[in-house]
Amino acid sequence: MTIYALSSGPGVSGVAVIRISGSETSKVLKKLTNKEIPQPRMATLRKINNINTSELIDEGIIIWFPAPESYTGEDMAEIHVHGGKAVVLALQNEISKFENCRLAEAGEFTKLAFQNGKINLLKAESIAD
């Protein structure tokens, strides 16, 4: 299962960060940008599109973190877009269209990091505070 969520917090802001983690992450990035995956851990400017119509949603920064060298230990990406509600909702709506992709539960990225040995229990508990 691949999960995604707004990781920059709710509300309007200048920049919003959508995090994606799981086996479908690379597929999601390729379809949203109509390009190959960027170099690992390199901030790359990309146009982010509707997967059915290719209509532009926003232009933003993509950062790709291949497994196992990611926060969760899985393939993971961050998409940094403009922080308006319309952009965030449109992007989340597009990601939700992928099979085996679902909205993450609160704390689920940290849970994966703990389960995959990326952080210890003390660190996991401190993140929750």
Placement of each model-derived feature along the sequence:
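A glycine-rich (often HGG/GG-containing) alpha/beta subdomain
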Residues: 1-129
